[in-house]
Structure formats: structure tokens, C-alpha cells
Amino acid sequence: MTIRGILFDVDDTLVDYSATARAGILAHLGAEGLLDRFASPEHAVALWKELEEREYPRYLAGELTFSGQQELRSELLLAHIGASTDDPRAWFDRYVALRDTTWAAFPDAEPLLSALTGRIAVGVVSNSSRSHQVGKLRTVGLLPHFGEAVLCSAEFGTPKPHPEIFLAGCDLLGLPPEQVAYVGDRWDVDGLGARDAGLRAYWLNRAANGTARQDGVTVIGSLTALSAL
């Protein structure tokens, strides 16, 4: 079946979220006078990432709100160094203000999207809020490629890997799932989720060399691999 549309994840697929989060938390802890209370800057970064990977899935499972998991991560990070805050929302927002000055798209994102223009429909399906991801895509210059075709779990009500959100993304493009590819950086949430929803699934593993096929998912090391679709 010919692929007529591609849906994209955003964080660590189109946008280098990991590098941005690293720079943001280091700048934030420095500004708060807390960085030297961690064993090392890298320890602070690793702990912040660990907390996100532990608490964010609880949001996806419906145990926490999107804002709630952010506030909890703030409280847990501070508790690790024996600190606290009366307003975890404001503490996280100060982190966001610093983090969001450093957003950058991966070098292969813009060339691919430009190459697809007029040939393949594109859209976004993301486990986040629409305002957040639209702002991010606008900052890095990629939003014009997507227009209104940005679907996020906070508004839709169901996150990846549930098939409903992938199928809603296909509807957004006006295409059946068998004519749509999905690419994201997480094997389970993106690769297996898209596969199980009936889309052609691509797992973006930037550490991979070349292209491979695994459990019905195509593994690619760069977005450039999609230019041949």
C-alpha cells in the first residue's frame, strides 16, 4: 500500500528534547542556587530524567494530570537534596521559562519536511498539550509544515500507545491507517502503538546504523530514511 501521509512524534523525534531539558534544568538549578547541592551536574540531570521517565507514564495511565506530574517531579527532585517549595507549580514554570529558550530541531527534520511538501501529507500526534507543542514547533520553525494538523493527548483525552489517538491522527489527514506512517523515538509507545493501530510504524533510534525490521516495526537511524517514501 502506498504511503500518502506521515504522522510525527515531536520530542526527541523532530525536536531535541533531551538536550533542551538538560540545558534547562542545569540553568534552573543554577539560578535557584541549588546545583552545588547535587553530587555533580550530571547527577542532577540524570535524576531529573529518571523522575520524568517514572512519573510521566503515570500521567499517561490517568493517575496524574499533566500539570500534576510536573509538580510532583519538582517536589521529588527538591526532596532528594533536602529542599522543598511551597509552590511546585511556580518552581516548574521557572524551569520551563529557561528550558524553552533553547529549543532546537534536529538537523534532519526541516530537510525531510521540505522534501515531503506537496507529495505526502504530514501531521503530529504527541503525548502532550497542543499549546505546548504548537509553541515548540513554532519556535524551531517547523509549524508551517503542519498547519492545524497537530493532535495532542491532553486535548484528545487518550494518549499513545492507545490506537484511538493514532486513528484520530489519520482522520486529521483524511487518510486510512494503512496509507499512513508514524515515526517516533519510543519503541513501545510509538513503534508498537502505531503498528497495533494499523499504521506503518517507524521507530527512530538515532543510535542505529541503517534501517532494519523488527516485530513489524521499521527501525531507522535518521529521519532522512523517510524521504524515500
Where are these regions (language model features)?
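Short glycine/serine/threonine-biased micro-segments
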Residues: 60, 121, 182
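Glycine-centered short loops/turns at secondary-structure junctions
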Residues: 119-120, 198
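Residue-level marker of alpha-helix boundaries and capping positions
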Residues: 65, 103, 124, 181-182
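Asp-based, Mg2+/Mn2+-dependent phosphohydrolase catalytic module
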Residues: 1-6, 18-19, 114, 125-229
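Catalytic-core regions built around general acid/base machinery
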Residues: 108-119
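N-terminal helical cap/lid subdomain that shapes the substrate entry/recognition surface
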Residues: 2-107
